[in-house]
C-alpha cells in the first residue's frame, strides 16, 4: 500500500544537460522545450506526457487534478500547476513569443530582450524579461507581477505593473468587461518555485541578485 501511494504521488525531477540553453534542436529550425519536472497526469496534445517528449510551438499542454509540469525553452521557463491548459505559440522566427493560457495556474520566468505575450480569454499580458504568475478562471484573473515590468491589457484599458518582489491583483470580469481590480496577497506560488525555474535556465531571481 505504501509503495502504491508513493508511486501515485511520485514526482520526477530531471536535470537537463542543456539547462540554460535555448532548447532541443529538431530537424530544421524548430525548437523543442526541455521538460525539467513532471508529476501526476499531464497531457501533451491529449497524449500522456513522458519526460522525454518534446514540447513544440503549437502544442497544447494540459495538467489534471494532480498534474504538474515544468519546462524551459529559448531562455524562458514555465511551471503549470494542476488543472491548467496552455497552448504554446511562436513568432515567424521560430521562437516562442505567445502563450495562450486557457485555464488554470501558470508561473513563468522570461529572459530579457524580445517581447512576449500571455493571452487569456479576457486579457493580454505584455512581457519583457520578468516573472509572473496567473490563475485564470471564467470570471476573474489573479495576476502577480513577481518582478520586472509587464502590461495588462483588457479591451481599451491598459495597466502597467512593476515590482521587485510580488505585486498581485485580482481582476474581475463581467461579460468580458473589466469590472474591478483589487490588491491581493501572494497566493499559490512562492519564491522557491521561482528560484527553481530561474535555475533551470541558468539565472537567479531578481530578488536574489
Question: Residue ranges of each PLM-predicted region?
Answer:
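N-terminal secretory signal peptides
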Residues: 1-9, 19-23
